[in-house]
UniProtKB/Swiss-Prot annotation:
GO CC term, one of those recorded: plasma membrane
Family to which this protein belongs: Belongs to the ABC transporter superfamily. Xylose importer (TC 3.A.1.2.4) family.
All residue ranges annotated as the ABC transporter domain in the record: 6-245, 262-507
Keywords: ATP-binding, Cell inner membrane, Cell membrane, Membrane, Nucleotide-binding, Repeat, Sugar transport, Translocase, Transport
GO molecular function: ABC-type D-xylose transporter activity; ATP binding; ATP hydrolysis activity
Protein name: Xylose import ATP-binding protein XylG
SUPFAM superfamilies according to UniProt: P-loop containing nucleoside triphosphate hydrolases (SSF52540)
Chain positions recorded as ATP binding sites: G38, E39, N40, G41, A42, G43, K44, S45
Uppermost EC category: translocase
Natural source organism: Burkholderia ambifaria (strain ATCC BAA-244 / DSM 16087 / CCUG 44356 / LMG 19182 / AMMD)
Enzyme nomenclature, EC number: 7.5.2.10
Membrane topology: Peripheral membrane protein
Length: 519
């Protein structure tokens, strides 16, 4: 067996006396891919910040050995010089700069006199991408011209340009399509063959199974186990992550589906940059009380734009005829939708869901502050009581309600956004990618909440790129493709293949509106 490239022993990191890491061990060998698994808030990101130099030597206890010698890093530059490079979930690219300029950002090649040697950066960038078998990227184009999948590949090229010996991938496929994820996994396998080691952090355990040789599980800041992937099952990893077995991820129970509550007809959204192009083209559908309506389709199909238009949040021009309980609605802004009884948890939690500077509690009550106001003054005691009730109901884990929401894990941020929308007491709740970047324990809690709301008569619209999630939750499934409605299926024996087949099959024109008659 080869000698370890990296050894972390007994890593302890505390914040205000509270241990975020408590004696964590991690070993990585050359050419090995180690899966790092744990619930949100388990300490994965904190451990990687210790390793990558974000938390410099001296701010934590324990030992890190790199290539057999102690690693003493005062910052990220030191670890990158050693060959440790992290690719964060939120990509660190400058959209306006070219691909080549991004690949060499901070490591620019200069000519005598200090001018950048752009031609040489282009040549080397092309060679890097060629080496990765990536031929669909023009390195002279701005990064903004490429989608999330290509940008992830650009980040990998940027890391290899820094001569990475250990690549840390933090939720690398969270915004990728299935095809883009396959390309990513192929590249990870290729890097392993070249001797590059990887730490692969992901809640998608099928990806961990596909590329990882070893899995290290941490829970509540402590090391639980390190075992070869060949000896593990997905259920075993989940049990180690959450400390219990999750026997039924989708706890479906019979629930009554009532009359139509929301009807949307002829929804059309024009592209923000190119108004002649339609992102959503004449889509009509209805949802009933107590119904869980799944919305599936390929990435970029127009699902999010469709939901934004209904909620009054689409940034471009849109038209729609919306009726609530049979009455026409004029929705020009999210505030109109919330007043009418429609709430939405957005896809991009960080950009559209939370106010990072505010505390957890104030994020929860943000949409309903009027409820706690008397003569222009907020009743702080009543507000705090509501905050604590919602935090307890949704198991939002935070030391106190005034903790900045940005310091919480993704799963707890998502539950806080859900709490805010539930405080509005909606008749219709739109959930756009509700479990993206959320660990399996938090997923199970969100699924239980969805079924509980359906039993109470709330109409739920769940947009998801995870087809098992759609099939596990939905009573009925809409399929969107290239802005069109391409299928409306009752979820009775429905398969992933049927959904994908509908997504890839152009709709007959004109689109037939969905009937709103009662069953």
């Amino acid at each position: 067996m080869t000698e370890p490239l990296l050894t972390m022993r007994g890593i302890v990191k505390a914040f205000d006396g509270v241990k975020a890491l408590d004696g964590i061990d991690l070993t990585v060998r050359p050419g090995e891919c180690v899966g790092l698994c744990g619930e949100n808030g388990a300490g994965k990101s904190t451990l990687m910040k210790v390793l990558s130099g974000v938390y410099p030597h001296g701010t934590w206890d324990g030992e890190i050995r790199w290539e057999g010698a102690p690693l003493v890093a005062s910052g990220v530059r030191d670890t990158e010089r050693a060959g440790i490079v992290i690719i964060h979930q939120e990509l660190m690219l400058v959209p306006e700069l070219s691909v080549a300029e991004n690949i060499f950002l901070g490591n620019e090649i200069t000519l005598p006199g200090g001018r950048m040697h752009y031609a040489e950066m282009v040549r080397r960038s092309e060679a890097l991408l060629r080496d990765l078998r990536i031929d669909a990227i023009n390195v002279a184009q701005p990064v903004m011209n490429y989608g999330g999948g290509h940008q992830q590949l650009i980040e990998i090229a940027k890391a290899l340009n820094k001569r990475a010996k250990l690549l840390i991938l933090d939720e690398p496929s969270s915004s990728l399509s299935a095809a883009e994820t396959r390309i990513l996994l192929d590249i990870v396998r290729d890097l392993k063959r070249r001797g590059v080691a990887c730490v692969y952090i992901s809640h998608k355990l099928d990806e961990v199974d596909a590329v990882c040789d070893t899995v290290t599980v941490i829970r509540d800041g402590r090391h639980v186990a390190t075992e070869p992937m060949s000896t593990l099952t997905t259920d075993r990893i989940i049990a180690m992550m959450v400390g219990r077995e999750i026997r039924n991820l989708y706890p479906r129970e019979p629930h009554e589906i009532g009359d139509v509550v929301l009807e949307a007809r002829n929804v059309t959204c024009h592209d923000v940059a190119n108004p002649r192009r339609k992102r959503v083209d004449d889509v009509s559908f209805a949802v009933r009380r107590g119904e869980i309506l799944g919305v599936a389709g390929l990435v970029g199909a127009g699902r999010t734009e469709l939901m934004q238009a209904i909620f009054g949040a689409y940034p471009g021009a849109s038209t729609a005829s919306i009726r609530m309980n049979g009455r026409p609605l004029a929705i020009r802004a999210p505030a109109d939708a919330i007043r009418a009884g429609i709430a939405m948890v957005p896809e991009d939690r960080k950009r559209h869901g939370i106010v990072p500077q505010l505390g957890v509690g104030h994020n929860i009550t943000l949409s309903v502050l009027r409820r706690f106001a008397t003569r222009g003054r907020i009743d702080a005691a009543a507000e705090l009581d509501a905050i604590r009730t919602e935090m307890q109901r949704l198991s939002v884990r935070a030391a106190h309600p005034f903790l900045p929401i940005a310091s919480l894990s993704g799963g707890n941020q998502q539950k806080a956004v859900l709490a805010r929308m539930l405080l509005a007491d909606p008749q219709v709740l739109i959930l756009d990618e509700p479990t993206r970047g959320v660990d399996v324990g938090a997923k199970a809690e969100i699924y239980r909440l969805i079924f509980a709301l359906a039993k109470r008569g709330v109409a739920l619209i769940v947009v998801s790129s995870e087809l098992p999630e759609v099939l596990g939750l939905a009573d009925r499934v809409l399929v969107i493709g290239e802005g069109e409605l391409r299928g409306d299926f009752v979820n009775d024996g429905l398969t992933q293949e049927q959904i994908l087949g509908a997504a890839l099959t152009p709709a007959r024109r004109p689109a037939e509106p969905i009937a709103a008659s009662n069953p």
